[in-house]
Design a protein with these regions (language model features):
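Class I SAM-dependent methyltransferase SAM/SAH-binding core
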Residues: 32-88
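C-terminal lobe and adjacent flexible extensions of AdoMet/dcAdoMet transferase-like proteins
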Residues: 179-223
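A short acidic, Gly/Pro-enriched loop at the edge of an enzyme's catalytic core
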Residues: 86-98
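A short SAM/SAH-binding and catalytic strip from SAM-dependent methyltransferases
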Residues: 96-109
Length: 223
C-alpha cells in the first residue's frame, strides 16, 4: 500500500480557489441548498465524495445510519478508504446514497466513476451529483455540463429524477446567499447543478395464477 501523503504536502488535485474564503463559502452555499434533497433519502449506509481534505468530512443533513467519507486526491480518493476513481472498495448494491460534491469534473475518468457509483447503489438507491456549472461566473475551477453528467448517469443505469441549479450567482466572501433551488430562467447561471439520479432495476411482473381447468360434462355449458 502506498505511503500516506503528509499533511504538509499540497494536494495537486485541489484547485486553489477551494482554499480561498470565497471558494469555501461557495461550497457551503451549494451544500446548504442541497439539504432539502438530501433529507428525502433514508437508509443505513451512504458515501460522501468531497473535493478536498479541507472540506468537513461530515455530510450535514443526511438521514443515514452511517456515511463513508472520502476526499479527492491526485491518486483518486482517500479518507476512511483509499481507492482509485474506478475502484470504489464497497460491495455492489450496498449503499442507499452516494453524494458526489465537485468530484466528477476533477476525475481522470468520470465515466468509470459514475459507473462505480451506480454499481454500489442499492436498487432505488440515489446518487446526488453536484457539478460546477460551466456557465456560472461564480466557479473558478473545472466544470461539467448537466447534459454530460446526465448522459454518464444514464449510460451507467441511472435515471434522472430531479435537476436543480444551486449555489450563488456571483463569487462572494460574506454570509450564505439566500434563496432556494428554483425554476427562474437565470438560475441556470448559479454556481452548480444538482442531479438526483436513481438506480432502476427492471422488476418482474408476477403472472396471475390461472384457475384450474374444469372438464365439461354433458349438460354443462361454459360461462
Amino acid at each position: 500500500m502506498p505511503s500516506r501523503r503528509l499533511h504538509s504536502q499540497p494536494d495537486a488535485s485541489v484547485h486553489p480557489w477551494l482554499r480561498r474564503p470565497s471558494g469555501r463559502q461557495l461550497v457551503a452555499d451549494v451544500q446548504r441548498m442541497a439539504i432539502p434533497e438530501l433529507t428525502r433519502i433514508f437508509g443505513q449506509y451512504g458515501m460522501y465524495l468531497r473535493p478536498s481534505a479541507e472540506m468537513p468530512a461530515e455530510l450535514s443533513g443526511n438521514m443515514l445510519g452511517r456515511v463513508i467519507s472520502l476526499h479527492r486526491t491526485s491518486q483518486g480518493f482517500d479518507g476512511q478508504l483509499r481507492c482509485a476513481d474506478g475502484e470504489l472498495p464497497v460491495a455492489s448494491g450496498s449503499l442507499s446514497l452516494v453524494y458526489s460534491l465537485f468530484c466528477l469534473e476533477t476525475s481522470p475518468d468520470p465515466a468509470h466513476l459514475v459507473g462505480e457509483i451506480a454499481r454500489v447503489l442499492k436498487p432505488e438507491g440515489a446518487a446526488m451529483l453536484i457539478c460546477a456549472n460551466p456557465w456560472s461566473l461564480a466557479r473558478r475551477g473545472p466544470a461539467m455540463g448537466v447534459a454530460r453528467a446526465e448522459r454518464l448517469g444514464r449510460e451507467a443505469g441511472l435515471d434522472c429524477v430531479r435537476c436543480h441549479s444551486i449555489g450563488p450567482y456571483w463569487p462572494r466572501i460574506e454570509g450564505a446567499v439566500g434563496g432556494q433551488a428554483g425554476g427562474r430562467w437565470f438560475d441556470g447561471f448559479r454556481a452548480a447543478t444538482l442531479l438526483v439520479m436513481r438506480r432502476r432495476e427492471a422488476g418482474l411482473t408476477p403472472l396471475r395464477k390461472s384457475p384450474a381447468a374444469v372438464g365439461l360434462r354433458p349438460g354443462m355449458s361454459a360461462g
